[in-house]
Amino acid sequence: MFEDRPDRDAEVVLVGRSNVGKSTLMRELTGHDFSTGGKPGVTRQPNHFDWASESFMFTDLPGFGFMSGVEEEHREAIKTNIVRYLEENADSILAGVVVMDGKAAVDIIDRHAERGNIPHDVEMFGFLEDVGVEPIVAVNKTDKIDDLDERLDEICDRLGLYPPWQQWSDQIAPICAKRGDIEALEECLRTRFHEHNRDDLLKFVS
């Protein structure tokens, strides 16, 4: 089980496959450095960054899926803990951000689907909806994508969102975390905070 979670009333969680840039995105959102690396699965426990006075925090949950040098049993345990964390804290989670590698996501999703498996990203997107947390998809590494609109349409299609992607701009956020280009995600988060009557949190995404 994950270590103790800080007792906060409001939270934004980052979820996604290993090595999609969640820790880099967490750094851009908080201004605080976290462990990052090219080796998938560096983050094994949640990273929390909180503001006690507002009872608010960002949480980077461990990556799921392939992790080099990590046994399948341990990967499954991490996934189980992620699911449990989201279930137990759904009432305080204002937004669940599913971070994807924009260049690789469609191929990975299609490869799993062809094997008859539910792709992890699609499963997590649906799971967040099931527990009452409206997901935001942060499509990262846009600097590596040739035709961004086409790729975002394809991702929407895989998630069951009817293209064009622009009509889902409150849920689909193209970003490039390593370049600090996260404005589309911040706009989505501002919308969520306002919907939850937490305009006091807008300063954290401005």
Curated annotation (Swiss-Prot):
Q: Name one GO molecular function term.
A: GTP binding
Cysteine pairings via disulfide bonds: none
Please list every transmembrane segment annotated in the UniProt record, as residue ranges: none
Keywords, sorted A to Z: Cell cycle, Cell division, GTP-binding, Magnesium, Metal-binding, Nucleotide-binding, Septation
Pfam families found in the cross-reference section: MMR_HSR1
Q: Which family does it belong to?
A: Belongs to the TRAFAC class TrmE-Era-EngA-EngB-Septin-like GTPase superfamily. EngB GTPase family.
Q: What does the function comment of this entry state?
A: Necessary for normal cell division and for the maintenance of normal septation.
* Protein name as annotated: Probable GTP-binding protein EngB
Query: Which lineage?
Result: Archaea, Methanobacteriati, Methanobacteriota, Stenosarchaea group, Halobacteria
- The gene for this chain is engB
